[in-house]
Amino acid sequence: SDLLRPQLRDRQARAGQDALPGTRHTLRHLAATADHDLCTLCNQLAQPLHKIFMESETYRAYQTIKIFTEFLGAESFAGLHKQADAKKLILFDVLAEPFGILGPEQFVRDFGHLPSARVVYRGKLTGAFAEDVRKNKYKTAEGVVCKGGKGGADLWMMKIKTDSYMQKLKQAFADKWEDYWE
């Protein structure tokens, strides 16, 4: 990552940003985040994940396991990060090949003790729940990702963002705000 830093700083300076933007369509490798303490962040999850994957007969049977995390700090917004802000990794999905992405119950059971996405609701996905999310009843920074099914081909997901997050996106990105929306 040391070789990437000068190039990233130049690109960030030209864009007037503290960090590279990410969107719902963009996966970014941690090395692309430049000056953050990557080893510490990765090790916070790597050691307990390795233990789970090695000790569980279920996980040892998979060909490949990929984890998906959100990289963020208290001042992060829409994939932009403040350099001085302390960052963390939050686990939100595990892909076990060839099965697919784990279902929500298995994810919470196996990984809920790690820094992971907070469960705000369990139950049927209803219009009333969606409206509660939009009005920020659950006090989230952006909104929620709803998941259901057992996992793999049976898994479904959908995002619901808060009205206040939508307003922040419109202020920050004008006509491109929908690139960062649900």
Model features per residue range: what roles?
Residues S1-E182:
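Core nucleotide-handling region used for phosphoryl-transfer chemistry
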